[in-house]
Design a protein with these regions (language model features):
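Hydrophobic faces of well-ordered beta-strands that scaffold small-molecule active sites
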Residues: 22-26, 50-52, 98-102, 127-129, ...
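N-terminal glycine-rich anion-binding loops that anchor highly charged ligand groups
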Residues: 14-21, 45-60
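Active-site-adjacent beta->alpha loops and helix N-cap segments on the catalytic face
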Residues: 2-14, 33-34, 56-68, 75-90, ...
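Glycine-rich phosphate-binding active-site loops on the catalytic face of alpha/beta enzymes
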Residues: 49-58, 122-128, 132-136, 176-185, ...
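Glycine-rich beta-to-alpha transition loops that act as phosphate-gripper elements at the mouths
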Residues: 27-32, 101-109, 133-134, 154-159, ...
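Conserved, mostly hydrophobic/aromatic
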Residues: 24, 43, 50-53, 119, ...
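A structural motif corresponding to the C-terminal end of an alpha-helix
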Residues: 17, 46, 83-98, 122, ...
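Catalytic cores of alpha/beta
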Residues: 33-44, 159-169, 204, 211, ...
Length: 257
């Protein structure tokens, strides 16, 4: 099974158990760089997939919480290379598939071929690149696909139908359905409009769909889980870590029966 297939399988396994898969986002090295491996291990033990944010100086898709986390991680010296080194050194490796969410510049600086090689060495299963347009993703996609790694595309309520279909065909691992039109951590779309949008995304995708941006409660997870197999939790988990709470306990409180 390739790395991107492992991501899809983890999400489908949750559905097979009658629950909504949780994709848990943390910013690497935040709030405490020294406890990164410990935090990651605990999160991976409670989530189905872990999304690790690579800190960036201009995180344009992120809300205040993740911007703050990104600044805090950068202040502690966290870089893409440091993250890959830490992941490679983890023993045992995380219990759930790991994907990196990174803006494009750090990936370009490392180089796509070297990035893909380092990902394999570090146990990274795939990447989410929010500022990489689908029609410009070919070179990165080729480097990742050659090694069985995921390139996870994002769609939103304003994605045109043709682009939605293209993203549904191209995405590996899962398809990221942004359920707000703004930045992370904001209020989600509601009711029939949200369900109609997510239904269109599911129909267009050949891989599992995970909905994210603005998910903060077990009720939201349950509501979204009626339409999509997976839900992404980011800002709320980062804020829980800032409060010194157990990430496993927080994620357990969001889990569906």
């Amino acid at each position: 099974m390739t790395a991107h297939e492992q991501i899809s399988a983890a999400i489908r396994a949750a559905a097979g158990e009658g629950r909504t898969a949780l994709v848990a986002f943390i910013t690497a090295g935040y709030p405490d760089k020294a406890r990164f491996r410990e935090t990651l291990a605990e999160v991976a033990g409670a989530a189905d997939v872990v999304e690790i944010g690579v800190p960036f100086t201009d995180p344009m898709a992120d809300g205040l919480t993740i911007q703050r986390a990104s600044r805090g991680a950068i202040a502690q010296g966290v870089t893409l290379r440091w993250i890959l080194d830490e992941l490679a050194a983890m023993a045992p490796p995380p219990a759930a598939p790991v994907v990196l969410m990174s803006y494009l510049n750090p990936l370009l600086a490392l180089g796509y071929e070297r990035l893909a090689e380092r990902a394999i060495e570090s146990g990274v299963a795939g990447f989410i690149v929010p500022d990489l347009p689908l029609d410009e993703s070919g070179p990165l996609d080729a480097a990742l696909a050659a090694r069985g790694l995921a390139l996870i595309h994002l769609v939103s309520p304003v994605t045109p139908p043709a682009r939605l279909e293209a993203a549904g065909r191209a995405s590996r691992g899962f398809l990221y359905a942004v359920n707000v039109t703004g930045i992370t951590g904001g209020a989600k779309a509601a009711g029939a409009d949200l369900n109609e949008y997510l239904g269109r995304v599911v129909a267009a995708s050949r891989v599992p769909v995970c909905a994210g941006f603005g998910v903060r409660s077990a009720a939201q997870v349950a509501d979204l889980g009626r339409v999509v197999p997976g839900v992404i939790v980011g800002s709320a988990l980062v804020e829980s870590l800032e409060r010194g709470e157990s990430p496993a306990a927080f994620l357990g409180g969001l889990a569906t029966p």
